[in-house]
Amino acid sequence: MEDPLIGRDSLGGGGTDRVRRSEAITHGTPFQKAAALVDLAEDGIGLPVEILDQSSFGESARYYFIFTRLDLIWSLNYFALLFLNFFEQPLWCEKNPKPSCKDRDYYYLGELPYLTNAESIIYEVITLAILLVHTFFPISYEGSRIFWTSRLNLVKVACVVILFVDVLVDFLYLSPLAFDFLPFRIAPYVRVIIFILSIRELRDTLVLLSGMLGTYLNILALWMLFLLFASWIAFVMFEDTQQGLTVFTSYGATLYQMFILFTTSNNPDVWIPAYKSSRWSSVFFVLYVLIGVYFVTNLILAVVYDSFKEQLAKQVSGMDQMKRRMLEKAFGLIDSDKNGEIDKNQCIKLFEQLTNYRTLPKISKEEFGLIFDELDDTRDFKINKDEFADLCQAIALRFQKEEVPSLFEHFPQIYHSALSQQLRAFVRSPNFGYAISFILIINFIAVVVETTLDIEESSAQKPWQVAEFVFGWIYVLEMALKIYTYGFENYWREGANRFDFLVTWVIVIGETATFITPDENTFFSNGEWIRYLLLARMLRLIRLLMNVQRYRAFIATFITLIPSLMPYLGTIFCVLCIYCSIGVQVFGGLVNAGNKKLFETELAEDDYLLFNFNDYPNGMVTLFNLLVMGNWQVWMESYKDLTGTWWSITYFVSFYVITILLLLNLVVAFVLEAFFTELDLEEEEKCQGQDSQEKRNRRRSAGSKSRSQRVDTLLHHMLGDELSKPECSTSDT
């Protein structure tokens, strides 16, 4: 048996007295500080580059870690700011229309409740106070000079000041002593901007998009030339025909209809008059659609995506540089003689300290020696900075994360008894997973039978409802066994376990409340809402597909793609929020039962009246319909008629150009390339796992990466050519 590099005794009683990274950096030995920095770098957490070289580095790091420990509060406040838009009463309602906004059916409003004026002010003041602390806290670890020279900090401060002024103006507006008219509020827009600036992934995506703006505008100009030229040909060609008399009545009308035809939303309706007059006219429209949709659109996508990858490579390179800077700082702490190299014994001391953290596990001397020799390019039994960075990366990727000792370790007589060890061994075994999968299948059958009987209003559904209640407590038992076996912290690391935990408890509590609550309580006595949660629980059946070889790669790829896509989907959501605020400001209140013009529009004809911009929830749903291009010209033409101006069309055209032609196409292209890249990685790992029997018999398995490591590997593999360019290694992001 291999001798471990670090024995269990050196971990401080099973790791319960772990050294906090912040304490190690501020008060630890050079090796403890270096280990904490390496651990931070491997976690993808970067201390601000400016404070790494400060003489007060330890004290600055202490305040930085205090700031990061409050991340949950900061994050909740970001979302609270954003969600306030959904619960604020629309500003047009403050003008006291007749009837009032309380008549939701008259204005086709959403069902979310509105905050009162007093509640809204209190909400804004609380979130603003937290935001002020969050904005100015970095001065404690960056220092005033660095803080006020950062453009990001200056923009944040400007947004906070604007938000403060807006809240003050709103307060004066609501008071009886001030003005009684407020035409505009900037707060809904500033909240979204603060949300973007405060979340690094969204901020990086915004920087990425701004970097490719020039390329996008160039290709957009080419698209405009194509559209203008094709519209001119159509206007001239059909001038004296029925098409020209009814549809292409002017060049502006022709341009408008040809733009919609470019999106195929009005195909073939727009050219039916021409087709009736001459079947040969279809040749023009068919060629236009083929060239526009299948050539010009894809040309735009190809050019934009190429620019996108170039900008993304710069960001990935920047993150690599941040990680390398952290590792260089750690290397400098170990290299006390400033020789530019460290030996194997110094590395061993470093990794002894790394066992205090969760990222890197215990490593045998033999395994560490093999890795060290493999990366020692000069064969002098010493490694330089470059080799040190490779060593840390190899350790992080080759070995699994160390499990955090369970709290039940405090009761060794029970936890380490023979019965307990047998139980924990069973929970860790595949048989336990098979048993839960079998129960899931039976539960799925029960849900199908119960819902079918419920639709048929059969009294036979009662026993099946009881069965679902029993299944709920079986899942509670499963959850308890996993927590007992792995410990809560290890259990909670897995996203699937978090999903199971939340859904299981909500269902069990809801079902219990339904059984014991009197029928007078309509919310709990009505179990319809629980049925949707039961269907959510059935999503766990997707895991069964992981056992099927032909589906395993697809499911694993999908799971990996989710976190890498979130910044781009989040950016689309933020753009929707900004456009929703504009829509409520410009179009709010136009859709109402007393507007005679409304019932002459296509919104009324198609029964789309609920999809309006009268409040924020309805506006977001309407924008989603525009995003997926579902009859989107209906809203554009209807609001043109309701406002009586062509300028309203710019709102919808700009939305199409930004969200659909740019953002949504980028997401589609990214998914396609990332999917095939992930399949290649899966195939490589499969081949590597079959290379030798020695690798299959390793005590710690290769390729067991964390989610962040898989995303990082995916991006580096996907952007390999771009990252290899010289400019990527020197670009300043």
From Swiss-Prot:
The record places domain EF-hand at: 322-357, 363-398
Q: In which tissues is it expressed?
A: Ubiquitously expressed.
Task: Please report the record's description of how this protein sits within the membrane.
Answer: Multi-pass membrane protein
- Residue spans that sit within the membrane without traversing it, per the record: 246-260, 616-630
Knockout: what is the outcome? Plants display an impairment of both the Ca(2+) inhibition of stomatal guard cell opening and abscisic acid (ABA) inhibition of seed germination.
What keywords appear on the UniProt entry? Acetylation, Calcium, Calcium channel, Calcium transport, Ion channel, Ion transport, Membrane, Repeat, Transmembrane, Transmembrane helix, Transport, Vacuole, Voltage-gated channel
Vacuolar compartment ranges equal 93-120, 180, 240-245, 261-282, 450-465, 520-528, 579-615, 631-651
A single cellular component GO annotation: Golgi apparatus
Carrying N-acetylmethionine, the residues are 1
Activity regulation information from UniProt: Inhibited by Al(3+).
Q: Which residues lie on this side of the membrane: Cytoplasmic?
A: 1-71, 142-158, 200-218, 304-428, 487-498, 547-557, 673-733
Q: Name one GO biological process term.
A: seed germination
Query: Which region is the signal sequence?
Result: none
Would the keyword Transport turn up in this protein's UniProt record? yes
Region annotation Disordered: where it falls in the sequence: 686-711
* A family per Pfam: Ion_trans
Basic and acidic residues: compositionally biased ranges: 686-695
Describe its function.
Answer: Functions as a voltage-gated inward-rectifying Ca(2+) channel (VDCC) across the vacuole membrane. Is one of the essential components of the slow vacuolar (SV) channel. Acts as the major ROS-responsive Ca(2+) channel and is the possible target of Al-dependent inhibition. Involved in the regulation of germination and stomatal movement.
Task: State the family named in the UniProt similarity comment for this chain.
Answer: Belongs to the calcium channel alpha-1 subunit (TC 1.A.1.11) family. Two pore calcium channel subfamily.
Please give the PANTHER family that the UniProt record associates with this protein.
TWO PORE CALCIUM CHANNEL PROTEIN 1
UniProt name for this protein: Two pore calcium channel protein 1
**Which classification does the entry list for the species?**
Eukaryota, Viridiplantae, Streptophyta, Embryophyta, Tracheophyta
Q: What gene codes for this chain?
A: TPC1
